[in-house]
Each structure stands twice: as structure tokens, then as C-alpha cells.
């Protein structure tokens, strides 16, 4: 059985479990090595959904599960440390967050972390969009004001 099989919207079972707030299923899928970096048809990863839920206080347990299984060498458990590591280490398979994703989602805390760690705020992606483009397009006033 393929734990990372995708449906017609490119969502994996992990995407669905997170969106349905099924903490026990998320934990089980992560134990079986579900990939939290697979993007669905909207370009969003399970880690992104988990972070969104945790950021808005809907369900921090799911975010803790994802970060626990994706911790660096199994030693990093503090969620802020995990954010920093994930944001700055593109070699890890489960990284979804970058400057553009943070701007699109309005994660000002993460934008600050990325920029203060030396990332270029004016960097453009393959679509010639900057972080500001994504913030405006997504109507994230917090990110635009940052």
C-alpha cells in the first residue's frame, strides 16, 4: 500500500487527516513515514496545513505530531526551533515553507525569521512573483504591512 497515494486533487491521506482534524490518524500516518512535503493541487503540503491549524490555535497537537516526526535527527522538539530549521534548510524533504509561502499565508513571525536569517525579501520565484505579490494576492494585510 502506498501511504503517500494522491487523489484527483493530489491530496494524500495525510492532507485529509489533517484537514479533518484526525489527530490519531495523523500520528499513525506519520509513524508509517507519510511524507509531509507532498503538495496538493493548490500547492499546499500537509505540513503547511498543520502549521496553519497550529498558528491559529485550532489544533496544535497535529503540528506537534508533524514536527516530532520531522525533527532533525530526532532531537529537535521545540516548535520554534523546528520552524527555524525548516525555513533555512531546503535540503530536507519536508520543507514547504519559504518566503513566498509565509507571505501568502500571512505568517509574519516566519517572515521575520526568514529575513533576519539573511534571506532576500525581494527574491522572485519561477512565476516572477515576490513575497509582496503573494501577500497582496492572498489579501494578507499583516504580511503586506510587514
Swiss-Prot record:
Keywords: ANK repeat, Repeat. InterPro entries: Ankyrin_rpt (IPR002110), Ankyrin_rpt-contain_sf (IPR036770). The keyword Membrane does not apply. Transmembrane segments: none annotated. It holds the Pfam family Ank_4. ANK repeats lie at residues 9-38, 42-79, 94-126, 127-145. PROSITE patterns: ANK_REP_REGION, ANK_REPEAT. SMART domains: ANK. This is Putative ankyrin repeat protein FPV224.
Amino acid at each position: 500500500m502506498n501511504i503517500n497515494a494522491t487523489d484527483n486533487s493530489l491530496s494524500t491521506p495525510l492532507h485529509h487527516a489533517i484537514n479533518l482534524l484526525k489527530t490519531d490518524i495523523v500520528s499513525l500516518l506519520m509513524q508509517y513515514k507519510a511524507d509531509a512535503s507532498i503538495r496538493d493541487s493548490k500547492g499546499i503540503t500537509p505540513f503547511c496545513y498543520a502549521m496553519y491549524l497550529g498558528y491559529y490555535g485550532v489544533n496544535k497537537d497535529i503540528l506537534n505530531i508533524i514536527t516530532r516526526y520531522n525533527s532533525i535527527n530526532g532531537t529537535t522538539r521545540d516548535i520554534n526551533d523546528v520552524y527555524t530549521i525548516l525555513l533555512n534548510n531546503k535540503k530536507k524533504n519536508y520543507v514547504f515553507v519559504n518566503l513566498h509561502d509565509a507571505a501568502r499565508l500571512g505568517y509574519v513571525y516566519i517572515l521575520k525569521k526568514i529575513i533576519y536569517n539573511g534571506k532576500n525579501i525581494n527574491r522572485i520565484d519561477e512565476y516572477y512573483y515576490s513575497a509582496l505579490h503573494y501577500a497582496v494576492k492572498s489579501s494578507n494585510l499583516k504580511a503586506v504591512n510587514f
